[in-house]
Amino acid sequence: MRKHLGGCWLAIVCILLFSQLCSVKARGIKHRIKWNRKVLPSTSQVTEARTAEIRPGAFIKQGRKLDIDFGVEGNRYYEANYWQFPDGIHYNGCSKANVTKEKFITSCINATQAANQEELSREKQDNKLYQRVLWQLIRELCSTKHCDFWLERGAGLRVTLDQPMMLCLLVFIWFIVK
């Protein structure tokens, strides 16, 4: 019985150490040498145009096709024209500590609507279908965003973030068993 408990403790310690080592990124000598690297712009060099590009609610268009169900007709239209649609939204509304998921999604949609008025009101031949697919895409993109503090409300320990607490818990249990 004593050897079995020792093996369990050894397995737990190995798992904790392995999870710690997996989160550490290895960096070799190549990363220390800064050959041909561009100098990052200072805050004084950031122009209004660059700031306008990353305003809250701005679309991110990289030409990726997303896996979202728009209905039969909408899916066909999206398959043919996915490159015209955004595949992300610049939005970080997590500054308020008490924001709920519903409020976050609503404010994300409102910010996106305000930031992209010309594209949302653009006249196209297939305007109704384009608008329907675009609005469903915006709702879906806003609903997939999340705030880190929502995770903290859940129960349980996260091994990667609570490792000191796990170590203290292991030491405490070890003293109780001993």
From Swiss-Prot:
InterPro entries: Doppel, Prion/Doppel_b-ribbon_dom_sf, Prion/Doppel_prot_b-ribbon_dom
Tissue expression: Strongly expressed in testis. Detected at low levels in ovary, spleen, kidney and mammary gland.
Lipidation (GPI-anchor amidated glycine): G154
Cysteine disulfide links: C94-C147, C108-C142
GO cellular component, one term: external side of plasma membrane
Compartment(s) where it occurs, according to its Swiss-Prot or TrEMBL record: Cell membrane
A GO MF term: copper ion binding
Tagged with keyword Repeat: no
Annotated signal peptide: 1-25
A Pfam match: Doppel
Glycosylated residues (UniProt): N98, N110
Residue numbers covered by the propeptide annotation in the UniProt entry: 155-178
Region (Cu(2+) binding), start-end ranges: 124-141
Biological process according to GO: acrosome reaction; intracellular copper ion homeostasis; protein homooligomerization
Membrane topology: Lipid-anchor; GPI-anchor
Protein family according to the UniProt entry: Belongs to the prion family.
Record note on domains: A short helical region is required and sufficient for Cu(2+) binding.
Protein name: Prion-like protein doppel
Naturally occurring in which organism (per UniProt): Bos taurus (Bovine)
Source taxonomy: Eukaryota, Metazoa, Chordata, Craniata, Vertebrata
